[in-house]
């Protein structure tokens, strides 16, 4: 899925803490070459924490002003579209640098949103699993040109998970049989599917680590705040066999045979927080500190519980919500749990008001963000109100309004 959206940003002062001009200029050079040398760049302070940009072109001189690298890149793309009739899209690009720069003025354009989100878990299966750095560089450039400053970054999740499972006593064979082929990894990460078309090779794991370093370095150079993966509670079959006293729940999804479905830890298991902590620590040891961590434990699946026992259901969901949050912050106390809201609409009969309230009840409001995926779906596909309306703006939690303009660019 490909998305855009809302929520948070930096401080303001008379000059930025980091160089925002150089990354923006380098990105623009990748679009128009040496012509970028003729552009004048200036920093301006954010407006009440929100990004701001200006464009001034007069007598052949083009000035781009912005409060961040992304704001300057967005200013450039706005100018190219409106003054030069050029643009960069997923379906093609037409970038022409008109000589001299056409006159144009656009003052004090303030973003209404502090964070603008892009991508979701499934994009990494539909579209990106075999991308190399050259292709990722183009996409990150496009993100900045469109104003994105909060991209999802889940490449190399399995390489980190492998390190964690080794520390938890599994061998490589037990770990590798857990993973799917690359194009199915998004659903593996959400606990929908294991083993299918796997395993992954040593070369794959090594190359994904190297690629993720390139991706994160560029995102951070541009001032973006990537969302990293976190542990969602799903464990390899080898781990289940080693711990027969733990009451794992066997999940079902998509009509796949039982051997391909996931086992999830109970929320009261001490392993949950231990593994979640290790995952965040191993990720940050490899890639550096991060703030936002994505964990999806119930995507398109229902917990195998008695639906008629409402109180037991609410209690279990509250315990899961608290445990997922604690498993992330055990590894980084400053972390924020991010989760997708797709399944709350997709399975609206399971996720009634009280059920979602229960899941969120033990997580601080400022330590969670819900990505309200697919706002074009409730009315036309699920025959419900938009999920954020059904759930009263997610009961005080921060949330991101999102659309699904296409499924991986394939239709």
Annotate each predicted stretch with a short phrase:
Residues 1-18:
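Bacterial Sec-dependent N-terminal signal peptides
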Residues 13-113:
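Contiguous, structured surface segment used for ligand recognition
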Residues 20, 24, 72, 76, ...:
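Stable alpha-helical elements in mature extracytoplasmic
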Residues 36-38, 87, 91-102, 119-123, ...:
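Catalytic-core regions of glycoside hydrolase
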Residues 61-66, 125-130, 202-203, 311-312:
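Second-shell loop/turn segments in exported
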Residues 72-75, 128-129, 227, 380:
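Short helix/loop capping segments that flank catalytic or ligand/cofactor-binding pockets
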Residues 107, 131-134:
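Catalytic and substrate-binding clefts that recognize carbohydrates or anionic sugar/phosphate headgroups
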Residues 113-132, 143:
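Active-site-adjacent substrate/metal-binding segments within catalytic domains
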């Amino acid at each position: 899925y490909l998305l855009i959206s809302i929520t948070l940003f930096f401080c303001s002062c008379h000059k930025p803490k980091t160089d925002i001009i150089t990354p923006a200029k380098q990105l623009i050079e990748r679009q128009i070459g040496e012509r970028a040398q003729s552009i004048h760049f200036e920093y301006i302070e954010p407006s009440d924490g929100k990004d701001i940009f200006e464009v001034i072109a007069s007598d052949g001189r083009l000035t781009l002003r912005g409060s961040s690298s992304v704001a300057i890149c967005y200013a450039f793309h706005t100018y190219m579209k409106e003054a030069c009739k050029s643009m960069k899209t997923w379906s093609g690009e037409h970038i022409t640098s008109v000589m001299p720069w056409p006159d144009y003025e656009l003052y004090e354009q303030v973003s209404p949103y502090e964070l603008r989100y892009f991508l979701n878990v499934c994009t990494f299966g539909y579209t990106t699993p075999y991308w190399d750095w050259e292709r990722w560089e183009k996409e990150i450039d496009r993100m900045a040109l469109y104003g994105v400053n909060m991209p999802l970054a889940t490449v190399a999740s399995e390489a980190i998970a492998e390190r964690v499972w080794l520390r938890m006593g599994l061998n490589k064979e037990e770990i590798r049989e857990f993973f799917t082929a690359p194009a199915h990894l998004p659903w593996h990460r959400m606990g929908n599917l294991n083993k299918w078309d796997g395993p992954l090779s040593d070369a794959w794991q090594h190359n994904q680590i190297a690629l993720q370093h390139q991706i994160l370095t560029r995102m951070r150079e541009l001032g973006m705040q990537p969302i990293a993966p976190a542990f969602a509670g799903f464990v390899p079959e080898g781990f289940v066999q080693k711990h027969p006293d733990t009451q794992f729940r066997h999940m079902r999804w998509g009509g796949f045979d039982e051997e391909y479905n996931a086992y999830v830890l109970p929320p009261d298991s001490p392993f949950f927080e231990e593994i979640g902590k290790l995952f965040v620590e191993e990720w940050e040891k490899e890639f550096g500190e991060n703030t936002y961590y994505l964990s999806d434990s119930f995507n398109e699946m229902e917990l195998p519980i008695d639906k008629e026992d409402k109180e037991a259901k609410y209690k279990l969901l509250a315990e899961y919500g608290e445990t997922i949050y604690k498993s992330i912050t055990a590894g980084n106390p400053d972390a924020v749990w991010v989760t997708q809201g797709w399944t709350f609409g997709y399975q609206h009969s399971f996720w009634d008001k009280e059920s979602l309230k229960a899941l969120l009840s033990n997580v601080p409001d400022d330590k969670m963000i819900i990505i309200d995926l697919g706002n074009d779906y409730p009315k036309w596909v699920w025959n419900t109100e938009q999920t954020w309306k059904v759930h009263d703006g997610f009961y005080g939690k921060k949330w991101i309004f999102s659309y699904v303009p296409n499924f991986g660019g394939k239709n």
